[in-house]
Each structure stands twice: as structure tokens, then as C-alpha cells.
Amino acid sequence: NPNLTWETSEQWDLGLDLDLFRNRLSLQMDYFDKRTFNLIQTQTMNWPSTIGLDAMLVNQGEVRNRGFEFQANWSDRVNKNFSYYISGNFSYLKNWVSDIGVKNADGTPGVWVGDGSFRSTLPYVYQTAEGQPLNSFYLIKTNGIFQSDEEAAAYVDKNGNRIQPDAVAGDLKFVDYNGDGKIDDGDRQYCGNATPKTTFSFSGGITYKKLSVSAMFQGVGGAQSLYVAKCMLLSDVEGNFNRSKEILNAWSETNTSSNIPRLSKNDPNGNFTTPSDWYLEDASYLRLKNLTVSYDLSDYLRKWSHMKERNSNLMVYLSGENLFTITNYSGYDPEVSKESSILTPGIDDSSYPRSKGFVFGINLSL
């Protein structure tokens, strides 16, 4: 396709680097504004479904990324036996589509629709519009759970008609956003996105004589994930696969404080088949990424004269990875994602989480 070109990016930065206190303290600060245009993506509008071919790749749209990064490092040797260091970084990112690149028939800006559907149960959950971030979740909002049949029956439109005619106590209450008296795709709203607003990490280490200990923490803030696995794990009680133990906490007349809808065989209210923000969760986290303890045995090794002549070294260490995670996310791992497309991240269908691991090693140089 001779009309298809590479994506183009323009970026400007404003930075500041400082070294203070005889280089014990270093600071790096950077503000950036990046514009990426002629994005390469599949044509999602004006492509007839009857043509029998997949939609072609086209250049369309413009994305902006604006934010700042900050990093600080401090290291010091207190005496010949003791030294330490502390390091941390923090970044903030604001992302939005500044030009969608397509128009509707009436001349208004179009949208990019990402699939993100889950099996045959949940339809598409993504849509990106001009002024919205990439990876925007496009969902029907909920307003709690009906606590009685009377409350469900009283949820009516301006004409007195029930908005959710099949709802009873224990069902989700969906927001009739467009006010037409029914719950459908017209009630979808932009509900955030999977891209973290902030990312951060900090690490530190101490060395006392031959013993060294170091640790690194890493995390994100403002990220969201659509935990679609709840559709299987918390829905009807029949089937040939295990449910989550949290299903025991589903709403009932004796457990009215639960945020899990009631158990039912056919789900007449669509609690689990409606693409709603009930699936959407805060995926912010703080993780102990690495902890390492090491001991230098070189002095013992060099007691042999030929090892001393060669200045040989010996160190043993024990290292742990992904030792614990602090998060409000109810899934296995707030970092996992089923989807890999740029327009469909942040879907969690209980993909395998990052594993915890331990490594014992020996570093020997002769």
C-alpha cells in the first residue's frame, strides 16, 4: 500500500540534572510533550462488512503524551565498614487522542472501537473518542445492588415504566445514562483506562563489612483493569469448572452488604452479561520486586596463596523475586492482561500471574 507510511513522532523535553554534596546526591527532572500522528491501525469505519476481506491498515489519528519524570539517588560511605544507598523515581503521564482521524456521516468526529469481548458473554468494552485517553473502557455504570424487590420495582422512568423490569433484590442497578427508560448500549460511558497515570519505584541497599542487603519496590497508580473472569468465577452455580470461593459471599437476604450480585441460574437481569463497571477495578499496586542478601567470602578464598595471587573472588547470595504485592485488586495479579493490542489492554481473564521465585547462587572468579 503506497499510501501507508510510518508513524511520526515529535517531542520536546525540558530537563534538569543536579549533583550535590560531593556527588552523594543526584537529581534528574524531565518534562516532556510527545505528539504521535499518522498512527497505523486497522480501518474501523467505512469498511463494508460484505466485501469479504479484512479491513486494511491505514494512517489515521494523533495521540498526545504529556508528563514528567523525577529521579533521586543518594549514596554514602559512613566508614570503611558501612555504606548505603537510596534511589527512587516517579513519573506522571497524561494521554489523550487529539485527532481521531475519521468523521461520521454528519461530519462529527468518529470513534475507534476496540473489541475486548470476552467469549460470547460480554460484548466489546473499549471505545476511544477525541479528547479521551487511548484504551478507554466504554461501559454501563452501576449504582449498587437493589436491596429489596420494592426498590427494584420503584426504579422507573419519567412515565412510570420500570427501567429494569426483570430486576429483583440482589441484582445490580444499572444507570440509565441517556434517560430513555431502558438499559442498552446507549447508556455506555467512558470509565477510565488501563494506562497508569503514575509509575514509581524505589530501591535501597546497605553493606556492612562483607554482608550486603538490597531491595527494590515497584508500582503504579491510577491504572484500571477489567476483571472479566468474574463472569465465570462468580456467576451461576452449575457448570464443569470451579468457581471462586468469593461466590460464597454473594448477595442474599442475610448478606446484604455484598457487592456480588445474587446467584441465579439464568441471570434474567443481565448482571454478568452486561458490559458494566462492576467488572472494572483499581489495578494500582506496590510490589516488592526483588530482595537480595549476599556475603563476600573472598578473604577466605584468598587464604590459598595461588588464589590470593590471582585476586580471586567468591560471593554467595540468596535472591527473591515478586515476594509480595499490596493492592486492592481482587484478581490474581494487577499486572496481567489478556490482550496485547494497543487498543485493548487491561483485560484480565485470570491469566497466569507473575510467579514468586527464589534463587541461590555463587559468584566465583579465579
Per-region residue spans from a language model:
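Outer-membrane beta-barrel and related beta-rich outer-membrane complex signature
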Residues: 37-43, 92-117, 222-251, 326-336
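Membrane-embedded beta-strands that build the outer-membrane beta-barrel scaffold
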Residues: 12-20, 25-33, 68-76, 84-92, ...
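Flexible, solvent-exposed coil segments and beta strand-coil junctions
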Residues: 4, 8, 43-55, 67, ...
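C-terminal beta-signal and terminal closure region of outer-membrane beta-barrel proteins
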Residues: 57-65, 112-146, 250-258, 273, ...
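Conserved small-residue
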Residues: 58, 75-192, 321
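Extracytoplasmic gating/loop element in the C-terminal half of outer-membrane beta-barrel translocons
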Residues: 161, 220-315, 319-321
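Outer membrane beta-barrel strand-and-loop segments of large Gram-negative receptors
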Residues: 4-5, 31-78, 171-174, 187-191
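Outer-membrane beta-barrel signature, preferentially recognizing the C-terminal barrel domain
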Residues: 1-26, 55-79, 131-139, 193-198, ...
